[in-house]
Amino acid sequence: MRTSILSMLALGAAAVSAAPAAAAAPAELVERGSSCTFTSASAAKAGKKSCSSIVLDNIKVPAGETLDLSNLKSGTKVTFKGETTFGYKEWKGPLIRFSGKNIEVNGASGHVINGGGASWWDGKGTNGGKTKPKFFYAHSLDDSTITGLNVKNTPVQGFSVQADNLVLDHITIDNTDGDKTNGGHNTDAFDVGESTYITISNANIKNQDDCLAINSGENIIFTGGTCSGGHGLSIGSVGGRDDNTVKNVTISDSTVSNSDNGIRIKTIYKAKGEVADVTFSNIELSNIAKYGIVIEQDYENGSPTGKPTTGVPITGLTVEKVTGSVKSSGTDVYILCGSGSCSDWTWSGNKVSGGKTSSKCKNVPSGASC
């Protein structure tokens, strides 16, 4: 239904003459009907509402500025072309911002969005050192799609998703340049919060933190992903925010390699919230350094305490066909639950090996194994 609505909007937009664009130098804007090609961030910001189709052509975003595609008119299509780059400045970002309804964002053949992360990387991420800009805010980007983007070297976190009914398909993030000493840190690929009906499919991620982190939200799908170099596929940390519910999530048919963790759920010590009806299915792990499967209810200030609490129950969890290898120095499975706060779990077809068997699991629910 959404596809047909978008098609009707596009046909309607083509029949209507565009409103005059804000003044811009000829080199910065080429406008044909309601189709616009922008070659500067300032021209895009000034003229975006006059266009139903936008091409961002080799834009060099000035230091400390956002490539601002917020509040687009409904039905707008935006294409990244060539290389998009960003000047260096210590600030919080974001480097790119999109919002609107029925928006289509895509990348032309051969394009790259180069975050220039090496200019900021110092091995500390958001925990100190240089102030680093977040990369891409998809906030209030509803009933929309982001497809086929090629991203390189985000300074810290990649896509921040806070939206309703958003599809992100075939997103590539390559942060392998950050694997060096004092390189990238906290380079999460997708951080999802306060969102509903989000689908992330066919992602190809190489980074130094979570491939996926769902902090809150409902009806979320992650499928067909390839994750390497980071911290794996994560729910949480859950708790301590305005929205502390994660519900109806499916993470499936994906691979995690050369990462600290395979799959994990972490909830905040003494916080309140809920993790319900989460499924991990058909996940292949390889060369995992710390934990193949880790579920713990003891996080405080970003680190485990070893003392689980019960304020964020984990119920209706399904872990099935999670298989693969952990390094000998790692742990295959670790489950640390509060008394009675993990229940109604389904655990089947899982085979994680190569690491140690934990002696510290606690309150493991019926059916699960540790």
Curated annotation (Swiss-Prot):
Known EC number: 3.2.1.15
An example Gene Ontology biological process: pectin catabolic process
Catalysed reaction, written as an equation: (1,4-alpha-D-galacturonosyl)n+m + H2O = (1,4-alpha-D-galacturonosyl)n + (1,4-alpha-D-galacturonosyl)m
Disulfide bond positions: C36-C51, C211-C227, C337-C342, C361-C370
Localization, UniProt: Secreted
Residues spanning the signal sequence: 1-18
Keyword Secreted: yes
PbH1 repeat residue intervals: 163-194, 195-216, 217-237, 246-267, 275-297
Any one GO molecular function term: polygalacturonase activity
Glycosylated residues in this chain: N248
Keyword annotations: Cell wall biogenesis/degradation, Disulfide bond, Glycoprotein, Glycosidase, Hydrolase, Repeat, Secreted, Signal
GO CC terms, sorted: extracellular region
Name the record gives this protein: Polygalacturonase 1
Taxonomic source organism: Penicillium olsonii
